[in-house]
Curated annotation (Swiss-Prot):
Protein name: Phosphoglycerate kinase
Highest taxon in the source lineage: Bacteria
Subunit structure comment from the entry: Monomer.
Any GO CC annotation of this UniProt entry: cytosol
Family: Belongs to the phosphoglycerate kinase family.
Location of the protein in the cell: Cytoplasm
HAMAP family: Phosphoglyc_kinase
Main enzyme class: transferase
Length: 400
């Protein structure tokens, strides 16, 4: 079902409540990476260029105690957003009450206002992350229309995305998707529902348990599923390959056997690994084919695996990649991840979609991000979408 998009709305003179994902790393008031702020700009610009009043909501981190508020205020985000928009952004250090209501009522057409971290509401009974209906209704009462542009939280049912949407729709008002959400639905949705073949999925990361739903779902859709990263060794154990001291989920070995039986030749595993005796960037390492000796642990895929994966990918028309091939945060064991990223940048005829923090960091580090079709902004959300799950934040948007 096609969803209502921000460009379908008449926003002129209207108070547009917009859920953005400004959950960015901040240390001592300094933003480490502003990608998520930049990603929201097209939708914000559409609203203000069409004389709407943009009232922005976002969470930042997790608030567990009163002291967390100081570190997790969105004030630095408002300052960065003002620089990016090249216009003032009103920051309201409150999530409800007269201060917020007055600030909204004093807005002119084309103004931008950022509400304080929505999770400040979690201190008193998890009202935001528990989707408290009264909070959703209250926030909805502050505006005329709602735009959800936060794909990063689309898999969560919170007051600031699902709560506002539902309350708006109950009052006969519209809830639309922003451009970022639309893009995610388009690329991730098409990749899973109507991909061009050959379709190859690359799944990395430490745990089979994190990716099990995705592997199972994609085995039914993809022509090949490449597995790398720490979860490889649970599959090795299931195949009877010795894994030394490598990471393994013993309680998932039977599951790995079932997946391999179901997959047949669709599942592609590494054939060699970069191994070391300790989990340390400076540990001496060697490339090992087949069985991993006792006392050694695999920390990255080896050169023959890179060749095998490139051979599997070279004719692909659709590629989805989520998760690293090794211990990406250690530079000596990042090569496998970087090689896969570099190769994806050469696939000019394919739709290439990357999600997950380490995979995204790899393509940005390599400078190939602009050669890929789409970089997903949602970690958990993109994984759940790839599992074929309905995401509450998307479901709550009005249909066209």
């Amino acid at each position: 079902m096609a969803k209502l998009i921000v460009s379908d709305l008449d926003v002129k003179g209207k108070k547009v409540l917009m859920r953005v994902d400004f959950n960015v790393p901040i240390k001592n008031g300094v933003i480490g990476n502003d990608n998520r702020i930049v990603a929201a700009l097209p939708t914000i610009n559409y609203i203000i260029e069409h004389d709407g009043k943009a009232i922005l909501f976002s969470h930042l981190g997790r608030i567990k105690k009163e002291e967390d508020k100081k570190e997790l205020s969105l004030r630095p985000v408002a300052e960065r957003l003002a620089e990016l928009l090249n216009k003032p952004v009103t920051f309201v250090p409150a999530t409800r009450g007269a201060q917020l209501e007055d600030a909204i009522n004093n807005m002119n057409d084309g103004d931008v206002l950022l509400v304080e971290n929505t999770r400040f509401e979690d201190l008193d009974g998890k009202k935001e992350s528990g989707n408290d209906p009264e909070l959703g209704k209250y926030w909805a009462s502050l505006g005329d229309v709602f735009v959800n542009d936060a794909f990063g939280t689309a898999h969560r049912s919170h007051a600031s995305n699902v709560g506002i949407s539902e309350a708006m729709k109950a009052e006969g008002k519209q809830a639309a998707a922003g451009y970022l959400l639309e893009k995610e639905i388009k690329f991730l949705g098409n990749a899973v529902d109507s991909p061009k073949h050959p379709f190859v999925a690359i799944l990395g990361g430490a745990k089979v348990s994190d990716k099990i739903g995705v592997i199972n779902h994609l085995l039914g859709k993809a022509d090949k599923v490449i597995v790398g990263g720490g979860m490889t060794y649970t599959f090795y154990a299931a195949k009877g390959i010795k894994i030394g001291n490598s990471l393994v989920e013993k309680d998932k070995i039977e599951l790995a056997k079932e997946i391999m039986e179901k997959a047949g030749d669709k599942l592609v595993l590494p054939v060699d690994n970069v191994c070391a005796k300790e989990f340390n960037n400076d540990a001496p390492s060697e490339v090992v084919e087949g069985d991993i000796p006792d006392g050694y642990m695999a920390l990255d895929i080896g050169p023959k695996s890179v060749e095998l994966f490139e051979d599997t990918l070279k004719d692909a028309k659709t590629v989805v990649w989520n998760g690293p091939m090794g211990v990406f945060e250690m530079s000596n064991f990042a090569k496998g991840t970087l090689e896969v990223g570099k190769f994806l940048g050469t696939l000019s005829d394919a739709t290439t979609i990357v999600g997950g923090g380490d995979s995204t960091a790899a393509v940005q580090q390599l400078g190939v991000a602009d050669k890929l079709t789409h970089i997903s902004t949602g970690g958990g959300a993109s994984l759940e979408y790839l599992e074929g799950k309905t995401l509450p934040g998307i479901a709550a948007v009005s249909d066209k």
